[in-house]
């Protein structure tokens, strides 16, 4: 009976005032929590709206900033050279006018790309650094592609057997069979100098090297290093050797090197001092690049007697290959190469021209053959006769004494 009474009190709240008060308190507590959660939800909604508005504002500011950066980079920019980083937002750059500037750096630029001597773009009015250029963007130095390599082979060069052997031993063999020099215990030659009178085949042999080797080939002329602004020439020398290191194995061919490598003297003008700075940078690069990197240097000149002794010393130009005027045997080989594709008459006797005592170069022999062919074309003939060769010989060798008086 007692348990039934307790159960009836639980089922009927009116039967107990204490239980009714407890239920009312719970309802008030739940109602308070509900109101609190509603206020929190309302506050969260307000915060969400604020964040969305702030996000829209930031996106608009980002678009405006990107448009401003594009506008800054779209105007004509000044090319400069990065020199030194002062802090995260400022640095020192050198302009092409020769002046150095303390400038601000655009916040969007990757600071890791800002290395000394890097080519950069500066705003034309504020000189602010707005872009970093690729390494090759401000350089006229480029590699010869496979299609650009000359089609000259060693067989196209008549004679010069000793010169061919020496340059292949000094340039090609260290690049293709470097282990031979390690087994013998010697260092391969670093550089090769080709010297001799004009027209003896120096550049022609360098073209054959470029054709036969698979290494990257960089060809420059000495006069290209002489630029208008101070520091541009030494920078180009550094660019040449940097490009060769990045594409090793590589061959650097500097033609007419006497334009920048004459013996140093007490220079009185800024131009002479700049040429001497180019020479000193060249000397430093030839001594400085790592011998383990397969980079070879070939230089050619007609005036080896005017070159600086520091360039000629062993360790820089280890092998010096002379190209003299061809002797009788060399003349015969050059004539055979030049006339191998020509339609000659049976009456043409090349030995007659080979045996003549005139000192002529290989280029003059090629000019004689070309002139003989031109005479045959002029006469509407398909066969070259001895008289055509005789006219070509006289045109290139037997010149009147009044011609080219300044060569005397």
UniProtKB/Swiss-Prot annotation:
GO molecular function list: ATP binding; ATP hydrolysis activity
Positions of modified residues (Phosphoserine): 16
Sequence positions bearing N-acetylalanine: 2
Compartments, as annotated in UniProt: Cytoplasm; Nucleus
Expressed in which tissues: Expressed in dark-grown etiolated seedlings, roots, leaves, stems and flowers.
Keyword Acetylation set for record: yes
Swiss-Prot/TrEMBL keywords: Acetylation, ATP-binding, Coiled coil, Cytoplasm, Nucleotide-binding, Nucleus, Phosphoprotein, Proteasome
SUPFAM superfamilies the record matches: P-loop containing nucleoside triphosphate hydrolases
KW Membrane (keyword) present: no
Main subcellular localisation: cytoplasm
Domain of life: Eukaryota
Signal peptide limits: none
Coiled-coil region(s): 28-75
InterPro entries per the UniProt record, alphabetical: 26S_Proteasome_ATPase, AAA+_ATPase, AAA_lid_3, ATPase_AAA_core, ATPase_AAA_CS, NA-bd_OB-fold, P-loop_NTPase, Prot_ATP_ID_OB_2nd
List of residues binding ATP: 196-203
Alphabetical list of Pfam families matching this protein: AAA, AAA_lid_3, Prot_ATP_ID_OB_C
Any one of the GO CC terms: plasmodesma
The protein's role, per its UniProt record: The 26S proteasome is involved in the ATP-dependent degradation of ubiquitinated proteins. The regulatory (or ATPase) complex confers ATP dependency and substrate specificity to the 26S complex.
Quaternary structure note: Component of the 19S regulatory particle (RP/PA700) base subcomplex of the 26S proteasome. The 26S proteasome is composed of a core protease (CP), known as the 20S proteasome, capped at one or both ends by the 19S regulatory particle (RP/PA700). The RP/PA700 complex is composed of at least 17 different subunits in two subcomplexes, the base and the lid, which form the portions proximal and distal to the 20S proteolytic core, respectively.
Similarity comment: family membership: Belongs to the AAA ATPase family.
Protein's recorded name: 26S proteasome regulatory subunit 6B homolog
Source species of the chain: Arabidopsis thaliana
Gene: RPT3
């Amino acid at each position: 009976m007692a348990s039934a009474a307790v159960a009836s009190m639980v089922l009927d709240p009116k039967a107990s005032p204490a239980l009714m008060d407890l239920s009312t308190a719970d309802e008030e507590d739940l109602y308070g929590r509900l109101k609190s959660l509603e206020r929190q939800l309302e506050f969260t909604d307000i915060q969400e709206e604020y964040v969305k508005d702030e996000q829209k504002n930031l996106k608009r500011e980002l678009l405006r900033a990107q448009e401003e950066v594009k506008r800054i980079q779209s105007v004509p920019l000044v090319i400069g050279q990065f020199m030194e980083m002062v802090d995260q937002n400022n640095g020192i750059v050198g302009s092409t006018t020769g002046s150095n500037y303390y400038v601000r750096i655009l916040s969007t630029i990757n600071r890791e790309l800002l290395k000394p001597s890097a080519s950069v773009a500066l705003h034309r009015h504020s000189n602010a650094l707005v872009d970093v250029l690729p390494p090759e963007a401000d350089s006229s130095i480029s590699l010869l592609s496979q299609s650009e390599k000359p089609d000259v082979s060693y067989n196209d060069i008549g004679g010069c057997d000793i010169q061919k052997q020496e340059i292949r031993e000094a340039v090609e063999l260290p690049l293709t069979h470097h282990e031979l020099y390690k087994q013998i215990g010697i260092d391969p030659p670093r550089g090769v100098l080709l010297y001799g009178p004009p027209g003896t085949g120096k550049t022609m042999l360098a073209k054959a090297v470029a054709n036969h080797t698979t290494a990257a080939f960089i060809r420059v002329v000495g006069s290209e290093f002489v630029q208008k602004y101070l520091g541009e020439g030494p920078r180009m020398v550094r660019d040449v050797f940097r490009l060769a290191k990045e594409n090793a194995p590589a061959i650097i061919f500097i033609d007419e090197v006497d334009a920048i490598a004459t013996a140093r003297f007490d220079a009185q003008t800024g131009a002479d001092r700049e040429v001497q700075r180019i020479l000193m940078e060249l000397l430093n690069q030839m001594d400085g690049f790592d011998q383990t990197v397969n980079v070879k240097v070939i230089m050619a000149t007609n005036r080896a007697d005017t070159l600086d002794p520091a360039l000629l010393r062993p360790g820089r130009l280890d092998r010096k290959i002379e190209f003299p005027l061809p002797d009788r045997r060399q003349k015969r080989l050059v004539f055979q190469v030049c006339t191998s594709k020509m339609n000659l008459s049976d009456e043409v006797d090349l030995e007659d021209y080979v045996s003549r005592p005139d000192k002529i170069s290989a280029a003059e022999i090629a000019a004689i053959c070309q002139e003989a062919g031109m005479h045959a074309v002029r006469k509407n003939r398909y066969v070259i006769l001895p008289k055509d060769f005789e006219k070509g010989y006289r045109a290139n060798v037997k010149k009147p004494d009044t011609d080219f008086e300044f060569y005397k």
